[in-house]
């Protein structure tokens, strides 16, 4: 049975906005891409790339949890945590949808692919069992952790709202990782192989979505 939470219409979730106090915490005295080398993207091009890939990634994450809930539905002992993680990912996606529109960034051309692939990954791992679904979560979130950390480190004080947003979302992704491990991810069948394959796929999707 499909969870009602898995059918939340895109665009109905309010985006996240960091508070003034949060902005102060992330000041570094640096500017975005101030140490870039010849041939590196300009600050504007870098932000365009960041927003494109982050929107794509959060779209994929929403679809993964929707796929897992479509398979596991109400019979899963983890349905509550799946809904919690989905709700947070929906806020992440709503935020990047707004940022892409406000800053006129170019969305990835591969959105339809990630829409299908994310759901398929979520449903496929759920069909392998609840622990495999949690292994999917830990693998994805570990890939996203490194991705968001790299973005955070490259943003300066001229992009404090985006920097604070990425830090907040990164901490929530790490929470999802910890939830996955606490709910048996390591006990999934062939965990090292499954986790490694999903991480590799996530990193490839990040690389492609930045560029296409």
Curated annotation (Swiss-Prot):
Pathway(s) per entry: Cofactor biosynthesis; ubiquinone biosynthesis
EC number: 1.14.99.60
Annotated Fe cation 1 binding sites: 58, 89, 92, 173
Domain of life: Bacteria
Keyword Metal-binding: yes
Catalytic activity: a 5-methoxy-2-methyl-3-(all-trans-polyprenyl)benzene-1,4-diol + AH2 + O2 = a 3-demethylubiquinol + A + H2O
Gene Ontology CC terms, in alphabetical order: plasma membrane
InterPro entries per record: Ferritin-like_SF, Ubq_synth_Coq7
Residue ranges, annotated region (Disordered): 1-22
Binding site residues for Fe cation 2: 89, 141, 173, 176
Chain intervals with Low complexity compositional bias: 1-14
Function: Catalyzes the hydroxylation of 2-nonaprenyl-3-methyl-6-methoxy-1,4-benzoquinol during ubiquinone biosynthesis.
Protein name, per record: 3-demethoxyubiquinol 3-hydroxylase
Provenance organism: Rhodospirillum rubrum (strain ATCC 11170 / ATH 1.1.1 / DSM 467 / LMG 4362 / NCIMB 8255 / S1)
Gene label: coq7
